[in-house]
Swiss-Prot record:
Binding partners and assembly: Part of the 50S ribosomal subunit; part of the 5S rRNA/L5/L18/L25 subcomplex. Contacts the 5S and 23S rRNAs.
Family of the protein in this entry: Belongs to the universal ribosomal protein uL18 family.
Annotated organism of origin: Aster yellows witches'-broom phytoplasma (strain AYWB)
Name of the molecule in the record: Large ribosomal subunit protein uL18
PANTHER family: 39S RIBOSOMAL PROTEIN L18, MITOCHONDRIAL (PTHR12899), LARGE RIBOSOMAL SUBUNIT PROTEIN UL18M (PTHR12899:SF3)
Name of the gene encoding the protein in the UniProt record: rplR
């Protein structure tokens, strides 16, 4: 019997395909996004040193939830933290999520706040 894979399993497959291509360096670290049912989490990662340079989430941005307003607030917050550490250029890793809705709002807010990708 043919069974349908869950959407999260398909997302993980897409994420693994993307991770073969996308990697962060010290000059251009990776902006990683994780979307749970309740919150949004964003990290800026240097893959060569395997360290997290800075992070933000929707709990920290005082906008509880995982909607578009929260995504915009988290995007502005992570851009502010990155620019304070001298990070201007990043590689956007959408973690297999479609570039639509919350993910697009987060990316647009990061760009509007001064990050380049």
């Amino acid at each position: 019997m043919i069974t349908k894979q869950s959407s999260n399993a398909l997302r993980k497959k897409r994420h693994l395909r993307l991770r073969k291509i996308v990697s962060g360096t010290s000059q251009r670290p990776r902006l990683n996004v994780f979307r749970s049912n309740k919150f949004l989490y964003v990290q800026i990662i240097d893959d060569t040193k395997q360290t997290t340079l800075c992070s933000a989430n929707s709990k920290e941005a005082n906008v509880w939830g995982s909607n578009i307003k929260a995504a915009e607030a988290v995007g502005a917050l992570i851009a502010k933290k990155a620019l304070s550490q001298g990070i201007k250029n990043v590689v956007f890793d959408r973690s297999g999520y479609f570039y639509h809705g919350k993910i697009k709002a987060l990316a647009d807010a990061c760009r509007k706040s001064g990050l380049h990708f």
